[in-house]
């Protein structure tokens, strides 16, 4: 599962991280900046949106449920009454590829810039979960394919914003998970993405999170250093007490909260570091595309990192192959 002692050591450090250094007090005034946070109606997405808004940013609260999103917006506004920023609901359903373009068009009808796309939304689907609208396994279809399509459709705006913005400030953040450590050797099997050979619910979730990492690596290669200047980085937000764990028993939840789980704001700090810290550059993420909690440079499992790298760098080229596969899946919806 972990492959080597170094991988185990890295995973252990991400389960029990040091206190965060990069928090609300670390970021400047964000007036004039525009952000999208998917899954912003609850958990770390809601916490992140609150931090950005408190610094006068305009934040698009992207979520499926308008009622839940509006409740989150009202909560955040009440918590930060002096903000000069804005919170705007953006309807999005990542489990339906046919609906994503209309969400992007709704955003583009209001904005000409996008400073950071926080791909925060995700599901942790049980084994008997229904498939997506297009028939994909729910974790893969929502967390990976839907998120990829959203990013692809917003990429021209990100690239255009980067032309007139400070170096390395325009970014795409991919929220992965420590669950990648439960994936198979190399991260994922390109020949079994339809799951004709069934896998456990944990493995399916892990594969979807490996997919986020692979997409981040390939976007960084195509549009980062020596290209268009968009920083793309994946992260493990940390072990958090969020709605993703709503299907756990009360006993499991109590034990995890006591020993392992942290409040969602800590995960928001991980995303905040990835999205705004000047320590992160397009050059840096070409070599190491993984941020751990609560804003630390870490390493993903060695065999996944090796598989993702281009063949020209001694890797297996999996990031490029998975990118091309995903492009084929979303082609009818672009």
UniProtKB/Swiss-Prot annotation:
Catalytic class of the enzyme: oxidoreductase
Catalytic residues identified in the record: 176, 205, 209
Organism in which the protein naturally occurs: Phomopsis amygdali (Fusicoccum amygdali)
Described function: Short-chain dehydrogenase/reductase; part of the 2 gene clusters that mediate the biosynthesis of fusicoccins, diterpene glucosides that display phytohormone-like activity and function as potent activators of plasma membrane H(+)-ATPases in plants by modifying 14-3-3 proteins and cause the plant disease constriction canker.
Molecular functions per Gene Ontology: oxidoreductase activity
SUPFAM superfamilies given in the database record: NAD(P)-binding Rossmann-fold domains
UniProt: NADP(+) binding residues: 44, 68, 93, 120, 152, 205, 209, 239
NADP is among the record's keywords: yes
Name of this protein: Short-chain dehydrogenase/reductase
Pathway annotation from the record: Mycotoxin biosynthesis
EC number: 1.1.1.-
Top-level taxonomic group: Eukaryota
Keywords: NADP, Oxidoreductase
Pfam families xref list: adh_short (PF00106)
Family stated for the protein in its record: Belongs to the short-chain dehydrogenases/reductases (SDR) family.
């Amino acid at each position: 599962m972990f492959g080597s002692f170094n991988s185990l050591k890295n995973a252990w450090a991400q389960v029990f991280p040091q206190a965060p250094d990069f928090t609300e007090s670390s970021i400047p005034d964000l007036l004039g900046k525009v952000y999208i946070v998917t899954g912003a109606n609850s958990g770390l997405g809601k916490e992140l949106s609150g931090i950005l808004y408190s610094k006068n940013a305009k934040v698009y609260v992207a979520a499926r449920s308008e009622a839940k999103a509006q409740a989150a917006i009202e909560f955040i506004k009440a918590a930060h009454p002096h903000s000069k920023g804005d919170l705007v609901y953006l309807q999005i359903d990542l489990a339906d590829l046919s609906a994503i373009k209309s969400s992007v068009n709704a955003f583009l009808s209001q904005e000409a810039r996008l400073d950071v796309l926080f791909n925060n939304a995700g599901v942790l689907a049980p084994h008997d979960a229904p498939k997506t609208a297009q028939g994909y396994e729910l974790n893969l279809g929502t967390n990976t394919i839907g998120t990829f399509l959203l990013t692809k459709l917003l990429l021209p705006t990100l690239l255009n914003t980067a032309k007139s913005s400070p170096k390395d400030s325009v970014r795409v953040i991919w929220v992965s998970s420590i669950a990648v450590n439960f994936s198979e050797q190399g991260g994922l099997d390109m020949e079994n993405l339809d799951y004709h050979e069934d896998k456990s619910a944990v493995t399916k979730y892990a594969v979807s999170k490996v997919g986020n990492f692979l997409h981040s690596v390939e976007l960084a290669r195509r549009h980062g250093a020596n290209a268009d200047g968009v920083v793309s980085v994946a992260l493990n937000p940390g072990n958090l007490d969020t709605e993703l764990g709503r299907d756990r028993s009360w006993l499991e939840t109590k034990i995890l909260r006591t020993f392992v789980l942290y409040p969602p704001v800590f995960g928001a700090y991980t995303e905040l570091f990835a999205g705004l810290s000047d320590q992160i550059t397009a050059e840096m993420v070409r070599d190491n595309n993984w941020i751990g909690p609560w804003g630390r440079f870490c390493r993903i499992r060695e065999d996944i990192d090796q598989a993702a790298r281009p063949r020209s760098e001694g890797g297996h080229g999996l990031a490029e192959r998975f990118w091309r596969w995903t492009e084929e899946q979303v082609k009818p919806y672009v």
